[in-house]
From Swiss-Prot:
Claim: Glycosyltransferase is one of the keywords in the record: no
Recorded family membership: Belongs to the PurH family.
E.C. code: 2.1.2.3, 3.5.4.10
Protein name: Bifunctional purine biosynthesis protein PurH
Database matches in Pfam families: AICARFT_IMPCHas (PF01808), MGS (PF02142)
UniProt cross-references to Gene3D superfamilies, sorted A to Z: 3.40.140.20, Methylglyoxal synthase-like domain (3.40.50.1380)
Originating species: Chelativorans sp. (strain BNC1)
Domain MGS-like: 8-158
Transmembrane segments: none
Keywords: Hydrolase, Multifunctional enzyme, Purine biosynthesis, Transferase
Length: 537
């Protein structure tokens, strides 16, 4: 039994006799209010909600009748009144509080049903500054916080999904709500207002271009409870921030089992990578395993791109994630369905493609209704012990003007196309990253090594293994190489030379750039500096 600050025990059951309803999302509110009214709960409401309930034949008192004060300033001030907040905050079993209520004719409010102005929708929907500010709710959060604080006597409902739960509890407890439920609803209300305020503060920081605000908050809504996290002994949930960026968080799952923690992490990595390639110009496919690409390719069709991507590392591709930058068609679906695949994510899928995928009942198909802009601003965050590392999203994209040829030999037109392709891929490979590419397809990928030369050697060996399995020569012969960061020594470049590469793209910026350039010239290698690093950890 919890007690108040005045050492007054909180009652287990609180009868609901009076409710205040004020909602922006009116989903289910008419039926919920009608059920309350059937239990002879007195209803008070505001503005559009009151009008809707009245039109639906439900007896309701306008909040101005409760307060004795009209709504003013275009509805900005309507519930910020002692008659409302006194009714929410009063400790019912405190004689002093009861006396104050009697003196000021304040009636207790037992149930508050509120959801907030749709600030997040306006923010991410491209509303202008004035419209976004106008959708910052003031009275709603104030009532939610007041009711949640006084959960000893008041129940607060913020989510239409909880209406049925509340009605079931009222039915079970003869019109009263139990303390545990009031606690849980209060916790949810505070989580909601915290996320709401986080969205507002984040929007202000973005609008004013404040890169490192003094306080930083993040909010999200539970989208899915996971069976477990990265490993079976870890608990996990997936939270959606409300950002409209096409991707795993906003995608529609057409079929397949529930996504796991690792599925979501890998699918996000896959789709972010494939969005580097403009679907209006080229078909592109990425195959991902453990958040690293094991094959990426461009093609004249998705099917061709998939076959080229798969050839890079067919062993690792088994049980992987496949991302496409165009509408999944039947030809590509047939190719993908030939091996075990966990998830396919694409902007859309034809009916024929969906029918093919449907034959693999456990294969998850996600449709995003578009591709993400790789240049779009945003934030990424990582937890560390006792803190958060927050940075802007790596939205750096190289243009031709960024490229600087630093060797005696310049890349050919074909080499340059492959260099730019490989560097796009390297951006999405865990550091240290080395990518061999040929004919606009990866042929060897080295990821996550502490030494860049080891990544170069692993990438070449992977290419050799794939070639040996296919009965051919390693495709690193005549390939190009991309590195996510500079070569600190010439050894990494020499490994690429040994593998048969003819051109290299890297950020540059090492103290030994001259040594690396000299080695490239000695071996007839063309090398391009981008001036942009893409570490990924």
């Amino acid at each position: 039994m919890t007690v108040s600050a005045k050492n007054i025990p909180a009652p287990d059951l609180v009868p609901v006799r009076r409710a205040l309803i004020s909602v922006s999302d009116k989903t289910g509110i008419v039926d919920f209010a009608r059920s309350l009214a059937a239990r002879e709960v007195a209803l008070a409401s505001t503005g559009g909600t009151a009008a809707l309930l009245a039109r639906s034949g439900i007896g309701v008192m306008d909040v101005s009748q409760l307060t004795g004060f009209p709504e003013i300033m275009d509805g900005r001030v309507k519930t910020l009144h002692p008659a409302v907040h006194g009714g929410l905050l009063a400790i019912r079993d405190d004689p002093d509080h009861r006396s104050a209520m009697e003196t000021h004719a304040i009636k207790p409010i037992d149930l508050v049903v509120i959801n907030l102005y749709p600030f997040e929708d306006v923010r991410f929907g491209g509303g202008d500054y004035a419209a976004t500010v106008e959708n910052i709710d003031i009275g709603g959060p104030a009532m939610l916080r007041a009711a949640a604080k006084n959960h000893a006597y008041v129940a607060v409902v913020t989510d239409p999904a909880d209406y049925a739960r509340v009605l079931e509890a009222l039915e079970k407890n003869d019109g009263a709500l139990p303390y545990r439920l009031r606690q849980e609803l209060a916790a949810k209300a505070y989580a909601r207002t915290a996320a709401y305020d986080a969205a507002i503060s984040q929007w202000f920081a973005e609008s004013l271009a404040i890169a490192e605000p003094e306080w930083r908050s993040f909010g999200g809504r539970l989208a899915q409870v996971m069976r477990y996290g990265e490993n079976p002994h870890q608990q996990a949930g997936f939270y959606a921030t409300g950002e409209k960026r096409p991707g795993v968080a906003t995608a529609r799952q057409v079929q397949g089992k529930q996504l796991s923690y690792n599925n979501i992490n890998d699918t996000d990595a896959a789709f972010e990578l494939v969005c580097e390639f403009d679907p209006k110009k080229v078909a592109a496919v990425a195959i991902i395993k453990h958040a690293n690409p094991c094959g990426v390719a461009e093609g004249t069709s998705l099917a061709e791109a998939y076959r080229k991507a798969l050839a890079c590392d067919p062993v690792s591709a088994f049980g992987g994630i496949v991302a496409l930058n165009r509408i999944l068609d039947a030809e590509a679906a047939e190719e993908i369905a030939k091996i075990f695949t966990e998830v396919i994510i694409a902007p859309d899928a034809t009916e024929e493609a969906q029918a093919i995928i449907a034959t693999k009942k456990n294969l998850r198909l996600l449709l995003t209704e578009g591709v993400a802009d790789p240049r779009a601003p945003g934030l990424s965050a990582k937890t560390v012990a006792g803190g958060l590392l927050v940075q802007t999203r790596d939205n750096g994209v190289i243009d031709d003007l960024d490229l600087r040829v630093v060797t005696r030999r310049a890349p050919s037109e074909k080499e340059m196309a492959n260099l730019k392709f490989a560097f796009r891929v390297a951006k999405h490979v865990k550091s240290n990253a080395i990518v061999y590419a040929r004919d606009l397809a990866t042929v060897g990928i080295g990821a996550g090594q502490m030494s860049r030369v080891d990544s170069a050697r692993i990438a070449a060996r992977k290419a050799e293994d794939a070639a040996a399995a296919a009965g051919g020569q390693p495709l690193t012969k005549g390939s190009v190489v991309a590195s996510d960061a500079f070569f600190p020594f010439a050894d990494g470049l020499l490994s690429a030379v040994e593998a048969g590469a003819t051109a290299v793209i890297q950020p540059g910026g090492s103290m030994r750039d001259d040594e690396v350039i000299k080695a490239a010239d000695e071996h007839g290698i063309a090398m391009v500096f981008t001036g942009m690093r893409h570490f990924r950890h």
